[in-house]
A protein has these predicted regions:
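The feature captures the beta-strand-to-loop junction immediately N-terminal to the Walker
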Residues: 42-44
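Helix-to-loop junction immediately C-terminal to a conserved catalytic motif
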Residues: 57
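Conserved ABC ATPase "signature" region
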Residues: 98, 102, 110-127
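Conserved ABC ATPase signature
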Residues: 131-135
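Conserved catalytic motifs of ABC-family nucleotide-binding domains
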Residues: 152
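Catalytic Walker B motif of ABC-type/P-loop ATPase nucleotide-binding domains
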Residues: 156-160
Length: 298
């Protein structure tokens, strides 16, 4: 399925005590998504990413412009964000998925087959019988994504799906979801304010900034994939392992964890992360070491 957005505008009416004001959120958005594309959409909080997804989903109407789906009159969407509140917390994950599968019109056999397939790819087999309320944030998000894929969608929309997750949980969700999309040839729009995440999963990139959408090629994203641009958090006992391999700068100490940056300007982030895995060091968090990546990209 091919998606086209043509000359899309979106305004909202903001009411205050004295008057109504028009607030422009999106202006002249033009976008083409081909079959099998995964578009990484970068933008700060409030840039309009969620608004754009809602327009594509048909939840809100654009002020002007058109949304065109070729080959599909009534496409099926998959959608996942970082909010787990739409699940039933006291029943098991499998019972949740069965309920939502029935809402999608799937038969019991189709639901079981879909859950089995998704369990293998997303690694959720061990938690299917666990009440949803007992899951970690990362596990909840895996179930959230499984729900969005229960019935193979024509287009998957992901709105900051790894927000608030630790590095390991984020990496697992990114890698498993990308594998499933590729295997099943499902196009997707993956929204985030984290360019590292988008660079791992996407073959196309775009930036929402100042109400407008701009395509960007992956080389611009990769240019900033140097370890020196990040601050890392690890537990105290792992710092000495890292010091044996690299020249680092300790930036702060919080409880039993230490934060540091690397000094090597030429060390790629991926190479650095592979080194940490090799020496058995687990990253607790990674933060960008400059103010706003969007200001550097274009």
């Amino acid at each position: 399925m091919k998606l086209e957005l043509k000359n899309l505008y979106k305004d909202f009416t903001v009411r205050n005590f004295f008057q109504k004001e028009k607030k422009s959120v999106l202006e002249d958005i033009n976008l083409t998504l081909e079959e099998n594309d995964i578009l990484g959409l970068l933008g700060r909080n409030g840039a309009g990413k969620t608004t754009l997804l809602k327009i594509i989903l048909g939840l809100i109407h654009p002020t002007k412009g058109s949304v065109i789906f070729s080959d599909k009159k009534d496409p099926l969407f998959g959608f996942a964000n970082s909010n787990p509140r739409s699940f039933f917390w006291r029943i098991s994950c499998k019972e949740n998925l069965i309920f939502f599968g029935k809402m999608l019109g799937l038969t019991s056999k189709e639901i079981d087959e879909s859950i089995d397939k998704l369990s293998d790819i997303l690694g959720i087999s061990d938690i299917l019988d666990t009440p949803f309320m007992l899951l970690s944030s990362g596990q909840m998000q895996s179930i959230n994504i499984a729900r969005s894929l229960l019935k193979k969608p024509d287009l998957l929309l992901l709105d900051e799906p790894t927000t608030s997750l630790d590095y390991e949980s984020s990496k697992r969700i990114i890698d498993t979801t990308k594998e499933y999309l590729k295997e099943n040839k499902i196009p997707a729009i993956w929204c985030s304010h984290d360019h590292l995440e988008l660079n791992r999963v996407s073959n196309k990139f775009g930036l929402l900034k100042n109400k407008r959408f701009t395509f960007s090629n992956s080389k611009i994203f990769k240019f900033h994939q140097k370890a020196i641009n990040y601050e890392f958090e690890v537990i105290n006992k792992d710092i000495d392992k890292i010091k044996l391999k690299l020249d680092i700068q300790i930036t702060k100490l919080v409880n039993i964890n230490q934060f540091f940056t690397v000094k090597d300007k030429n060390l790629d982030l991926d190479e650095f992360l592979r080194l940490l895995i090799k020496i058995d060091v687990k990253i607790i968090s990674i933060e960008k070491n400059f103010n706003h990546f969007e200001d550097y990209i274009l």
